[in-house]
Amino acid sequence: MIKKFDKKDEESGSGSNPFRHLEKSAVLQEARIFNETPINPRRCLHILTKILYLLNQGEHFGTTEATEAFFAMTRLFQSNDQTLRRMCYLTIKEMATISEDVIIVTSSLTKDMTGKEDVYRGPAIRALCRITDGTMLQAIERYMKQAIVDKVSSVSSSALVSSLHMMKISYDVVKRWVNEAQEAASSDNIMVQYHALGVLYHLKKNDRLAVSKMLNKFTKSGLKSQFAYCMLIRIASRLLKENEEGHESPVFDFIESCLRNKHEMVIYEAASAIIHLPNCTARELAPAVSVLQLFCSSPKPALRYAAVRTLNKVAMKHPSAVTACNLDLENLITDSNRSIATLAITTLLKTGSESSVDRLMKQISSFVSEISDEFKVVVVQAISALCQKYPRKHSVMMTFLSNMLRDDGGFEYKRAIVDCIIHIVEENPESKEAGLAHLCEFIEDCEHTVLATKILHLLGKEGPRTPVPSKYIRFIFNRVVLENEAVRAAAVSALAKFGAQNENLLPSILVLLQRCMMDTDDEVRDRATFYLNVLQQRQMALNATYIFNGLTVSVPGMEKALHQYTLEPSEKPFDMKSIPLATAPVFEQKAEITLVSTKPEKLAPSRQDIFQEQLAAIPEFMNLGPLFKSSEPVQLTEAETEYFVRCVKHMFTNHIVFQFDCTNTLNDQLLEKVTVQVEPSEAYEVLCCVPAPSLPYNQPGVCYTLVRLPEDDSIAAAGTFSCTMKFTVRDCDPDTGVPTEEGYDDEYVLEDLEVTVSDHIQKVMKPNFAAAWEEVGNTFEKEETFALSSTKTLEEAVNNIITFLGMQPCERSDKVPENKNSHSLYLAGVYRGGYDLLVRSRLALADGVTMQVTVRSKEGTPVDVILASVG
């Protein structure tokens, strides 16, 4: 019986959790009563509950003590008490991984799963599968097959769910149960049908054709379970995304037909699936949006919430498709559920006209303080999207955001506001001073180090270019006086940027930096000393290199290189060119703003750092030097062919490594000694091939081809390679995968592979392009004019140039202002070998686009390559 606590105990909270002060040693001591005769079910139940509570609270049980408690617990199978037996099953599952010799209960569990007590059979199956390994699975295979098709739904579901878990241990054994799973899928029980469909999908998910057949079968025969329908919709949408089929396919028709299902769950799943399909047109979205519009007026809050949240996502990409729902959304603004009201307003912000912005902002202001931080973030993201859509409304937005910034709130909420203000400042030059003023006010009382350093970085970047830069110095130096070490260090860097760009402020900045040299923190002192010495030289080139633009190398790569340098002392100075470059950040489309992640940010190695490590581990590539650039994968086969091959081009100083990722999609073949032979155009030289030892069915493998680049860089800039995959084939049994002993040689022709000028250039960001331009100098400057007769707009010309050259646009010059007939594009990069490369392109629109290209580098070769490739 449950103990009744005194009312006073309840109020004080002392009796709310009877297990709060449990000690592991005392509980294990109590577990000795499991060995007593006769068994006392009530006491044993209480002790098992305590053990499970400790395990779920994260209490560590040693192997010995866990095994002793487990063995004692096995005696409880002698009792016929139903509740005690089911508690034993739970304990077995929890202790399976921490106890030794858990298989001793196999016979007891097997007896229960095949017995007449239905209440035992399901839990016994789940417990047995938890302790079974791959070697024991075949012993219970017959029982599992029987259980899957059992007439008792709880037993069948238990066996099916256990089968899903057993796939991780022994996929091949579970694969033999496919006929039983097919039979269970026709069950009248909704949960059995749902679980059976899950098992069938996971058995076939690596075979697209089998999944398509399964989908076709169930869409024709129909299902009784709404849960199974939801899973089938998810399988169908995944198939559409993978196959990139047109939306005219029967699979899309099935998803659309589910919009007319009698279950609301299925209707919503179908609408959500259609909305999340890539490349969906407004016409294809219309039925899904209509269904969600009906849900907006549902009496059920959960349905209204689901509808408005999904419409909110649609509005990011297809605002015009949601416009029809505006009246329903306006009715939801006054919804008693604040989450629904918030989403309704933020959706309206994305779909409404410019004239409705002021009214909506007033409505948000009336209740924004009442909603949770999570939804405040959604509001801020909607405002950010709105700023991009209606730039002239930035002053209204800025006022609203600054008021929100003063309110109480957590880190994620404040970060979203700060990011939004920074975005407005960068996109709208006329809002710069107002935005910086609000941020300066915020850092005066900011408790978040990350945000303070981010704002100081922005002040250092944008502040020196404002009409009155001196007004920001006080706010920055206050951080040096009042804040922690990280913020003080960021403030020192910001001060240095003001001194580097404003000659009249330099004497004051030097005085402030001298004061910073007395700081208690060595990072702050080091920065102050470094910047002071650079600024005292009064050289623009030094300022550009060490203050404005900073390092462009990979930080994890630099850490490894420096560590290696310290292990092998050398008289030669450390060479910065031995470090891989950092890849330029890829800015997301602003329309696709996602919820702010709550996970802590880590300095994870980049894709290029991972490739560098993988290639360095291959003996043939050890002496190629640092990896300069890795391209995006290029597909060399059609989607539905026998073999799937794609290539990643790894560029080094004098070599290129082609990495071929190969997959064999034939289940009756094993491929061995797989290589890709490349036939280059003249001047390139193939040095060696590193084969993939074997390619079993559906398991990816990698082979490499090493090519020496021509010495004449103007020839090396572009080339075409014909590719042929060569291998030894061994036929094998599709069911067992066992190959024959004899093999034969074969080959497969792949599509041609192109090397372009962009493969030789790595993007780097230059925050201050003018300073970088002066730093490089005009020693190797060249200028030419070209006519782009086929290009009709400046935007098209800018995008084509950026894509072709593979360089990083600077100073936001990739954005062409409206109604302009001329534009300047600034591009920065590093050419293979470590040479800085800058391009200034002046574009004029007349009959087509005329382009004047000026290229600078510290070497002549990169300049010639760029002009030759453009011409």
Swiss-Prot record:
Segment Disordered: which positions?
A: 1-20
Record bears the keyword Oxidoreductase: no
The modified positions for Phosphothreonine read 594
Q: Which InterPro entries does the annotation name?
A: ARM-like, ARM-type_fold, Clathrin/coatomer_adapt-like_N, Clathrin_app_Ig-like_sf, Coatomer/calthrin_app_sub_C, Coatomer_g_Cpla, Coatomer_gsu, Coatomer_gsu_app_Ig-like_dom
Composition-biased stretches, type Basic and acidic residues, lie in 1-11
One function term, GO molecular function aspect: structural molecule activity
Do you know which SUPFAM superfamilies this protein is assigned to? Answer: ARM repeat, Clathrin adaptor appendage domain, Subdomain of clathrin and coatomer appendage domain
Q: Localized where?
A: Cytoplasm, Cytosol; Golgi apparatus membrane; Cytoplasmic vesicle, COPI-coated vesicle membrane
Query: What keywords were assigned to this record?
Result: Cytoplasm, Cytoplasmic vesicle, ER-Golgi transport, Golgi apparatus, Membrane, Phosphoprotein, Protein transport, Repeat, Transport
Protein topology in the membrane: Peripheral membrane protein
Q: Might you report a single GO cellular component term?
A: growth cone
Mapped HEAT repeat ranges:
64-101, 283-320, 321-355, 356-392, 395-430, 467-504
Q: Name one GO biological process term.
A: endoplasmic reticulum to Golgi vesicle-mediated transport
Cited Gene3D superfamilies: Coatomer, gamma subunit, appendage domain, Leucine-rich Repeat Variant, TATA-Binding Protein
Question: What family is this?
Answer: Belongs to the COPG family.
Quaternary data = Oligomeric complex. Binds to CDC42. Interacts with JAGN1. Interacts with TMED10 (via cytoplasmic domain).
**Mind telling me which PANTHER family this protein's record contains?**
COATOMER SUBUNIT GAMMA, COATOMER SUBUNIT GAMMA-2
Task: Explain the purpose of this protein.
Answer: The coatomer is a cytosolic protein complex that binds to dilysine motifs and reversibly associates with Golgi non-clathrin-coated vesicles, which further mediate biosynthetic protein transport from the ER, via the Golgi up to the trans Golgi network. Coatomer complex is required for budding from Golgi membranes, and is essential for the retrograde Golgi-to-ER transport of dilysine-tagged proteins.
The identity of this protein, by name, is Coatomer subunit gamma-2
